[in-house]
């Protein structure tokens, strides 16, 4: 018996096609011209925990070993170079750009473990090796203590032609129909921001807005209490469709939990009664309440060693992880680094006037200061490349970065106007009307509101790569160095003199 049944197969429509992003290797032609660039010795000095101000004026900046250093490298415009080879490129049909081939970030100063802490740190009880049951975490006393430790060990080197993107947890907007109370836990959300020079990195206390979400100012070290600690958003930068924010990166993070303790304060989300059996009140205890479950650790980065250094070594860029294979659009490079393995804090001590002529004295006769210093040097190997000014390339570049076309001084000529306009001859005389004010020049820099360490290499390029350390490494690695062959010496020719025979008579 035949029975008709409706089909059970499901039909799936093909997904909509996505816009294809071409790789820079498809429209950027590389030449055999290379340049070497190097910065000066870059130094910075400041207080390791906070900046010192006097009446709104900053006297000493904050220079912490746990801060990001973001260098904005400005390169010269290769289209303004005077090349001896006229066949290198056609300025009517092509434009020149820089491509990054090698980089080396050198760090000075000796290795040293940085120390961070807080003189009023929220440490209540030792829960690692407890000797007594403390359940008075919510009383009226102040249990804060002065505590210091070494942070998580972080080394990071990241570079691209746009700034790196960071992520952190911040307070979210609260719902208007159900407003929370002041003591309720605020909603939080993950936000993305640009990593700027001087931002704090994550050192074991989470990537979050500590200033907004921790009102006690005692949950983290001093350098984080009024700051935002950011973590690079590797997931988002790896999915960047143009691949400009991260050509490649090298990182090393290391941490272990050194000590375990609990925090004091009211426990609004205490342990539910069904999760434990009610305890018996012991002698000397004010109540039989359960202790707080607000646990915390003190991080430690452990040993610093020269065997595990990310810096002071050369990196060669053969193939970037994104679609941008090292092309430095707008003639700039952003280098983002973190290195707290050279986090030694210098202690400076001066004598008071009463102690200058004495050999012994009390501590009140001395004044102490804290400073942290950092030393950098950046080296680059750049390759000269060219882009054809085809309509397809210009359309794509304009949709990606409109400033590229503007910097190349490519514009469409305006159509002639059909109206008659007035043009006065003597604009500066009192006989004619005042000339209209010139509009202020608009700052077209898209990063004018961000803070970076500006490094200008416009006059620090050289094509003599064999005269510099990184250049010689590149020549040896790439096989571009001319190897001279010694011409073999001619074989010696032996001349045998024949002896003349005397003629017999």
UniProtKB/Swiss-Prot annotation:
Q: Give the residue ranges for region: Disordered.
A: 479-505
Q: Name one GO molecular function term.
A: structural molecule activity
**GO CC terms in record:** host cell nucleus; T=7 icosahedral viral capsid
Please verify whether the record's keywords include DNA-binding: no
Keywords associated with the record: Capsid protein, Disulfide bond, Host nucleus, Host-virus interaction, Late protein, T=7 icosahedral capsid protein, Viral attachment to host cell, Viral penetration into host cytoplasm, Virion, Virus endocytosis by host, Virus entry into host cell
**Where does the protein principally reside?**
virion
Spell out the Pfam families in the cross-references. Answer: Late_protein_L1
What superkingdom heads the lineage? Viruses
GO biological process, alphabetically ordered: endocytosis involved in viral entry into host cell; virion attachment to host cell
| InterPro entries per UniProt | Capsid_L1_Papillomavir, Capsid_L1_sf_Papillomavir, dsDNA_vir_gr_I_capsid
Compartments reported by the entry: Virion; Host nucleus
Q: Does the keyword Thylakoid apply?
A: no
Question: Could you say which protein family the record assigns here?
Answer: Belongs to the papillomaviridae L1 protein family.
Query: What do we know about how this protein assembles, alone or with others?
Result: Self-assembles into homopentamers. The capsid has an icosahedral symmetry and consists of 72 capsomers, with each capsomer being a pentamer of L1. Interacts with the minor capsid protein L2; this interaction is necessary for viral genome encapsidation. Interacts with protein E2; this interaction enhances E2-dependent replication and transcription activation.
* Function (record text): Forms an icosahedral capsid with a T=7 symmetry and a 50 nm diameter. The capsid is composed of 72 pentamers linked to each other by disulfide bonds and associated with L2 proteins. Binds to heparan sulfate proteoglycans on cell surface of basal layer keratinocytes to provide initial virion attachment. This binding mediates a conformational change in the virus capsid that facilitates efficient infection. The virion enters the host cell via endocytosis. During virus trafficking, L1 protein dissociates from the viral DNA and the genomic DNA is released to the host nucleus.
Protein's name in the database = Major capsid protein L1
Q: Which organism is it from?
A: Cottontail rabbit papillomavirus (strain Kansas) (CRPV)
Q: Name the gene for this chain.
A: L1
């Amino acid at each position: 018996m035949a029975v008709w049944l409706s089909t059970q197969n499901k039909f799936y429509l093909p997904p909509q096609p996505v816009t294809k992003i071409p790789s820079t290797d498809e429209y950027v032609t590389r030449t055999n011209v290379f340049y070497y660039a190097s910065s000066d010795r870059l130094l910075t000095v400041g207080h390791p925990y906070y900046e010192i101000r006097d009446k709104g004026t900053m006297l000493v900046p904050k220079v912490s070993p746990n801060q990001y250093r973001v260098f904005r490298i400005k390169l010269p415009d290769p289209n303004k170079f005077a090349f001896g080879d006229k066949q290198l490129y056609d300025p009517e049909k092509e434009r020149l750009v820089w491509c990054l081939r090698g980089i080396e970030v050198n760090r000075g100063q000796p290795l040293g473990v940085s120390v961070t802490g807080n003189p009023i740190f929220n440490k209540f009880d030792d829960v690692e090796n407890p000797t007594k049951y403390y359940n008075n975490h919510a009383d009226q006393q102040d249990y804060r203590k002065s505590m210091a430790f070494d942070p998580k060990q972080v080394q990071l080197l990241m570079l691209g032609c746009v700034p790196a993107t960071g992520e952190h947890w911040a307070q979210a907007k609260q719902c208007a129909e159900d407003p929370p109370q002041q003591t309720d836990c605020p909603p939080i959300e993950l936000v993305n921001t640009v990593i700027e020079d001087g931002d704090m990195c994550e050192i074991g206390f989470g990537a979050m807005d500590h200033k907004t979400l921790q009102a006690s100012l005692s949950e983290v070290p001093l350098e984080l209490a009024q700051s935002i600690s950011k973590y690079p958003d590797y997931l988002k930068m790896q999915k960047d469709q143009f691949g400009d924010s991260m050509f490649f990166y090298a990182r090393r993070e290391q941490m272990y939990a050194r000590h375990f303790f609990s925090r004091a304060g009211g426990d609004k989300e205490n342990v539910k009664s069904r999760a434990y059996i009610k305890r018996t009140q012991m002698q000397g205890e004010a109540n039989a309440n359960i202790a707080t479950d607000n646990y915390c650790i003190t991080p430690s980065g452990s040993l610093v060693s020269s065997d595990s250094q990310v810096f002071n070594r050369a990196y060669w860029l053969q193939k970037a992880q994104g679609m941008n294979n090292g092309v430095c659009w707008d003639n700039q490079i952003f280098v983002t680094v973190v290195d707290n393995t050279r986090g030694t804090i210098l202690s400076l001590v001066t004598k008071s006037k009463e102690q200058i002529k004495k050999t012994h004295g009390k501590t009140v006769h001395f004044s102490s200061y804290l400073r942290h210093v950092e030393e950098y040097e950046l080296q680059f190997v750049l390759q000269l490349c060219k882009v054809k000014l085809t309509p397809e390339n210009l359309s794509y570049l304009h949709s990606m970065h409109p400033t590229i076309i503007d910097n190349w001084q490519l514009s469409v000529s305006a159509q002639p106007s059909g109206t008659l306009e007035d043009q006065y001859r003597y604009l500066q005389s009192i006989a004619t009307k005042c000339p209209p004010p010139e509009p202020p020049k608009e700052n077209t820099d898209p990063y004018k509101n961000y803070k970076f360490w500006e490094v200008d290499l416009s006059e620090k390029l050289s094509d003599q790569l064999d005269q510099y350390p990184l250049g010689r490494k590149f020549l040896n690695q790439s096989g571009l160095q001319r190897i001279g062959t010694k011409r073999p010496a001619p074989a010696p020719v032996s001349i045998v003199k024949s002896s003349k025979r005397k003629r017999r008579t």
